[in-house]
Design a protein with these regions (language model features):
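A short secondary-structure junction signal
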Residues: 33-37, 83, 92-97
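Short amphipathic alpha-helical segments, especially helix-boundary/capping motifs
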Residues: 46-47, 84-87, 124
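Structured beta-strand-rich core segments of catalytic domains in phosphoester-bond hydrolases
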Residues: 1-79
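Metal-dependent phosphoesterases centered on the DNase I-like endonuclease/exonuclease/phosphatase
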Residues: 91-179
Length: 179
């Protein structure tokens, strides 16, 4: 990063909390059972996708741009686990593709979590909600992680659709899915 500029921290931002995330719920949040992986180091990921050359501060770099939260909800007496995140944009770096690699691992975190790598997986229904900053078909970024997550049999993609869409030249995916 550059001292005194937005790139000088664990995530891009001029001040603490810029680009953060929040959960607003009409259902009861079981905060006693919530888990926050925002402080988890990128190095603690199974097989992190590091750039080929070591990065300055690599040993203290957090995985999450904003956070990876496991938030149990009580929905009319039934448990629902909300898994929330906001991944880094996989662009705006150099040929080392640090942002693309970090975005890849931020998304792949959920697959490892479902496999039990970080101390348990949800026992009942769950929702993964947030901003992956990555399209599984179009745009820049490493598509493998989002494709693996969406292809996991434990995950159902509701594929929300928009009716009024414009297509862009070179767009391969269904533009109605770009909500």
């Amino acid at each position: 990063g550059r001292l005194g500029e937005p790139e000088d921290a664990h995530s891009y931002g001029w001040y603490a909390g810029e680009g953060g995330q929040a959960i607003l719920s009409r259902f009861a949040i079981r905060d006693d059972a919530a888990r926050d992986f925002a402080q988890m180091l990128w190095a603690d990921m199974p097989s992190p996708l590091w750039p080929s050359e070591p990065m300055p501060g690599q040993e203290v770099q957090r995985l999450s741009r904003a956070g990876h939260w496991i938030v149990p909800l009580d929905v009319r007496g039934a448990p629902l686990t909300l898994m929330s995140f906001h991944a880094t944009t996989p662009v705006f770096d150099g040929p080392e593709d640090r942002n693309g690699r970090r975005n890849h691992d931020e998304i792949l975190f959920w697959r490892y979590y479902l496999d039990g790598a970080f101390g348990g997986a949800p026992k009942g229904p769950f929702v993964i909600a947030g901003n992956a900053n990555l399209d599984p078909v179009d745009g820049e970024g490493r598509k493998t992680a989002i494709q693996v997550l969406l292809g996991d049999t434990r995950v159902q993609d509701p594929k929300p659709r928009s009716e009024r869409v414009e297509t862009t030249p070179g767009h391969k995916g269904d533009p109605k899915l770009d909500t």
